[in-house]
Amino acid sequence: MQVPLLDLSAQFARIRPDVLRALEAVCDSQRFILGPTVEAFEQAVAGRLGAAHAVGMSSGTDALLAALMAAGVGPGDDVVTPTYSFFATAGCVWRLGARPVLVDVDPATLNATGEAIAAALTPKTKAIIPVHLYGQMADMPPILAAAARQGAVVIEDACQAIDAADSSGTAGTVGAMGAFSFFPSKNLGGFGDGGLTTTNDDGLARQLRLLRGHGAATRYHHEIVGGNFRLDALQAAVLTAKLPYLDAWTAGRRANAARYRALFAEAAPGVGVSLAAPIAGPTPDGVLSLPFERPGVTHVYNQFVVRLGRRDAVKAHLAEAGVGCEVYYPVPFHLQACFASLGHRRGDFPIAEAAAGDSLALPIYPELTEAQQRYVVDAVLAGMTRPRPAVPAGSPA
């Protein structure tokens, strides 16, 4: 059996007529840049999330970059963010000449905590970027409280978390702004790059719209220097066609996560694998930690990330078995060569480093069958219990 990490063909087969009609309508209109198709999509997403404004952007990266620019982040400013995320979270800060002030993550959720963020604030802190990693919201009230004491702008990195929610609200609507990605692998994915920035502030919304179009509200008359961050109409058409299916897809992901938990709980003890809560250090051999879901949270499972001993050996075994998997992410920001001037070293953020060494994303797309999930579970457990290769005589242990 082959089980890919993501099967976009299975999704497209079910929605093909809707998507092709939407694309044909844009082609007939010949309105490819912004225009009514993009505006309709923005209004639909804003209404869905409960945001006053949704501004379509060319990618999740540009959605985050534009939010930072709208917040006035620039040289000499500090921006606090977790060291464990997709590169753009810190990369956008760096591009504006500001300094990413990195914090470690909670071992259970791999999200930054309010306590860690509060401890990292400096007199120069202009913004805070909490990340809703893998589809689960960070605990926002303590983060918002820390930001209020500092007077810092909170920009949510919700790129993996559309429709995620907790008692504080919906991802992307709790802080001053929220950034979303519509990369094809996301729960709501386009046919290429796309993104969106949300806000409840009218002034920030106007600034975001200026920034995405080179700072011009009127063509060739530029109030500020922006960029070309526009969401094109073809992507907006695809996303609009997909949007009515998102509830069912999210429910499918959550159901698959629950089934994984049941299947691992059923099968792991019989092969000598222990299920345990995530720990701050590396996961020991023979131990498997399933994703932790905070009480009262709607986790949308863009990724189903387990932590386990001998991760690389298990990953290799899964490749042999035809099971797709991926490491999100193998190198935390503080150990990236491009951020060497920040002065960090290995050991500074041990929880993120441990997760980078033992985390593994398994297939979680909504079209997965029970048989496929059973196959994945069996393959993971077989990889965990596979005997280590014999060490040749005379070789170092």
Model-identified regions with their sequence ranges:
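N-terminal "arm"/small-domain region of PLP-dependent enzymes with the aminotransferase-like
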Residues: 1-31, 36, 363
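Hydrophobic/aromatic ligand-binding patch that stacks against planar heteroaromatic rings
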Residues: 92-93, 146, 170, 187, ...
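Conserved active-site segment immediately N-terminal to the catalytic lysine
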Residues: 156-191, 218-223, 288-289
